[in-house]
Amino acid sequence: MITAADFYHVMTAMVPLYVAMILAYGSVKWWKIFTPDQCSGINRFVALFAVPLLSFHFIAANNPYAMNLRFLAADSLQKVIVLSLLFLWCKLSRNGSLDWTITLFSLSTLPNTLVMGIPLLKGMYGNFSGDLMVQIVVLQCIIWYTLMLFLFEYRGAKLLISEQFPDTAGSIVSIHVDSDIMSLDGRQPLETEAEIKEDGKLHVTVRRSNASRSDIYSRRSQGLSATPRPSNLTNAEIYSLQSSRNPTPRGSSFNHTDFYSMMASGGGRNSNFGPGEAVFGSKGPTPRPSNYEEDGGPAKPTAAGTAAGAGRFHYQSGGSGGGGGAHYPAPNPGMFSPNTGGGGGTAAKGNAPVVGGKRQDGNGRDLHMFVWSSSASPVSDVFGGGGGNHHADYSTATNDHQKDVKISVPQGNSNDNQYVEREEFSFGNKDDDSKVLATDGGNNISNKTTQAKVMPPTSVMTRLILIMVWRKLIRNPNSYSSLFGITWSLISFKWNIEMPALIAKSISILSDAGLGMAMFSLGLFMALNPRIIACGNRRAAFAAAMRFVVGPAVMLVASYAVGLRGVLLHVAIIQAALPQGIVPFVFAKEYNVHPDILSTAVIFGMLIALPITLLYYILLGL
C-alpha cells in the first residue's frame, strides 16, 4: 500500500508546478505584467528550448540495453489501436474530423509520465516502475511526438489544398513549396499559384506572400491611401492591397471618371461586371473618389490565391442573359476566378485556359476584397491568418438593379449564383472547424457537404506531406534532442562514458526549467482566456472520460494481447490513467488545434488524477 511518505513524494513533484502556473496566471490576470505578444514569446521559448532539453535529459539518462520490450509493446499497441479506430471514424463517419482525431489521440494515449508517473509509480511499486516510465518517455519523444507533428503537417496541407483549390484539386499533378516555407501550420502568410504548363496539367507553387508587402510599401511611397474604405455593400468592407490594420473605416476616394473609364473597350483592368450590375442607389454609403490604380495587362495563364489576407478569393458570376458581353472584360483571377458556365453575360479572353469550370487568368495584384461583420474582431489582420476557415453569407438588400453579393463555400454545380469565397477568415466560433456553417437562401448547410471531396492524387499529397514533415523535423529542436539523446545513451551505456560536467550542468539548468516553464505557459494561456474551463463543462467531462476511462481500458486490452500479467499489468494500467501530458498541450497551442481542451485536461486532470489512480491501485490489488 502507498504510505504517507509516498504521498508526500508525489506532492513535492506536483506543488511546484502549480506554483509556476498560478504565478503565470496572476502575472497576466491580476498584475498585468505580460502582454499577449510577450506571452507568445514565452510559449516559443518553451517549445524551442525548454522542452527539447528536458527530453534530451531523460533520453540520455535511459539505458537502451535494459528496456522492457514487452511493456513497451503493450504501450505501443494501445496507441496503434486508438489511432486506427480514430482514423476509421474520421474516414467513415460524417462527423469525423482530423482535428478531433489528433486531439482524441492526445487525450487517450499521451499521459503526464514525467510529472506524475515517475514519483507516483515509484511509491506504489518500487524503483523499477520509475525506470519503466522513463522508457515510455523515450518512445513518446522519439516516435509519438514525431507522429503528432506528421499529423499536424498533414492537416495543414489538406486545409491548404481544399481552401485554395476547392474545384480543381483533382487536376493538380505537382505541388512545389518554396524552400523558405518551414511549415503549413497557417501561422505565416502564404500564397499559391496554379499554372497550366506545356503538358496541359495543373502545377501549383506555394510561396510566402512577401510580394504583397512590397507592393504596399511601393504604393505608400506614392502617397496612396492605406486605410479601409466604406462600401455600399451591406456588412461588407472593400480593402485594397495597401489596407492597414486600422479598424475605423474612413471616406473613400473612389473616382467615378476612373471607374467608368474601365468600361471603355481596350482600357483598364478586365472585369466581368456588366452595366446591369453597376451600383445604383442603395442604403449604404455612396462611392467617393478612388485612387484605384489601373495597371492591367496581359499575363500568362495562372491562377493565384493567398492563404492569409491577400487574394484568397474566387469571384464567380453566373451567366445573365445576353447583352452583357459588350462591357469591360473579366478581372485577373489573382483575385477573382470567373465561372464560364453561364451564358454570354461576360466577355473574356479567348485564350484563357479553363480548369475545373473556372477561367484562369493571371496578374491579379491590385484589388482584394475582405468581408467582415461587426461580430468579427475589431482589428482586421490583413495579412495574418484568421485561425479558422469559417464562412458566412451576406447579401445586399436587393432590388432589380442591385447586385447580389454572397459569400459561401463553392459547389461544383452552383453556376447560377454570384458569390465571393472567403478563406480562413473567422466569422464565428473558431475552435471547431468541422461545424462551420454557410447559409444559402436562409437554409443552413454544413460546410462538410460543400467542401470539395476530391483531393490531388495520393502520390502528390504524400510527397508534399513528406517534404513538409522533413522540413519541420530538421528545424524542430525536439528532433535533434531525441536523436542526440538516444545516440549518447547508446554510446555511454555501451562503453561506460560519462558526459563532461560542463555540458551536463549546462543542459541540466535549462532542462530542470522545462516542466516549470511548460506549466508557466499553461498559466499564461489560462489568464488570456475569459474562463478557467476554456472548453466548457461538457467538453471537459468528455476529455476526462477519454483520459481516465478509455485510455486505461484500451491499455488493458493491449496488455493482455502481448501477455503482460501481474505487477507489469498493474503498472501499465495505472500509467494509462495518469493525467494529461503537458507536451501535447504545447503542440496544440503552437498549431492552434483545440488548445483549450488540452489545457483544461491538464489542469483538472492533475487535480483529480491522484484519487483516480489510487482507486485503480486499490482495485487492481484486490
Swiss-Prot record:
Bilayer-crossing regions: 7-27, 45-65, 71-91, 101-121, 132-152, 483-503, 507-527, 542-562, 567-587, 602-622
Subcellular location: Cell membrane
Disulfide bonds: none
Biased composition (Low complexity): 298-311
Result of changing Y145A: Strongly reduced ability to bind auxin (e.g. IAA) and impaired auxin (e.g. IAA) efflux carrier activity
GO cellular component entries: apical part of cell; apical plasma membrane; basal plasma membrane; cell periphery; cytoplasm; plant-type cell wall; plasma membrane; plasmodesma
Residue list for modification Phosphoserine: 209, 212, 221, 225, 231, 252-253, 271, 290, 317, 320, 337, 374, 377, 408, 414, 426, 434, 446
Induction record: Down-regulated by endoplasmic reticulum stress treatment.
Sorted UniProt keywords: Auxin signaling pathway, Cell membrane, Glycoprotein, Membrane, Phosphoprotein, Transmembrane, Transmembrane helix, Transport
Outcome following mutation: S290D: Phosphomimetic, normal auxin transport activity
Side Extracellular, residues: 1-6, 66-70, 122-131, 504-506, 563-566
Tissue expr: Expressed at the basal side of elongated parenchymatous xylem cells.
NCBIfam families: 2a69
Quaternary data: Homodimer. Interacts with TOPP4. Interacts with FYPP1 and FYPP3. Component of a complex made of PINs (e.g. PIN1 and PIN2), MAB4/MELs (e.g. NPY1/MAB4 and NPY5/MEL1) and AGC kinases (e.g. D6PK and PID) at the plasma membrane. Binds directly to NPY5/MEL1.
Family the entry assigns: Belongs to the auxin efflux carrier (TC 2.A.69.1) family.
Name of the protein this chain belongs to: Auxin efflux carrier component 1
